[in-house]
Structure formats: structure tokens, C-alpha cells
Amino acid sequence: MPKCPKCGAEVKEPIKTWVLAPKGRKGVIIGLFRCPNGHYFRAKVGEAPPKKEAA
């Protein structure tokens, strides 16, 4: 569970997630979180599979 960098509160569920990956390489899944004190922050949620190139 990610912790808020400002207040240290643990947050369970992200508001939104997206894949951040360079071309042809393995990327990461980033999540946008909001702590109980109202601070927004981003954190790594998981690993993304490598993109498959079209032939």
C-alpha cells in the first residue's frame, strides 16, 4: 500500500491508473491516489507487460 509523502497515511485504492512505458520495453502501472487529508500523489502500482510490436 502506498503512503502519502506529505502526511504518511496509507491509501488502499487508486482513483485512476495508467501504463507508463517506453517504446518496445517493459513499463510500469502508475496510480493516482488521494489520502484522507486531501493530498493527491502518484505511486507505482505494478509492472506492465512489454508492448507487442506490429510486424
Swiss-Prot record:
Q: Does the keyword Cytoplasm apply?
A: yes
Q: How does the record describe the protein's post-translational processing?
A: Methylated at multiple sites, to varying extents.
Kindly give the InterPro entries that the UniProt entry links to this protein: Cren7_sf (IPR038647), dsDNA-bd_Cren7 (IPR020906)
Molecular function GO terms recorded = double-stranded DNA binding
The source's superkingdom equals: Archaea
One GO CC annotation? chromosome
Main localization (coarse): cytoplasm
Q: Which UniProt keywords apply?
A: Chromosome, Cytoplasm, DNA-binding, Methylation
Q: What does this protein do?
A: A chromatin protein, binds double-stranded DNA without sequence specificity. Constrains negative DNA supercoils.
Subunit-level organization: Monomer.
Protein name in the entry: Chromatin protein Cren7
- The gene for this chain is creN7
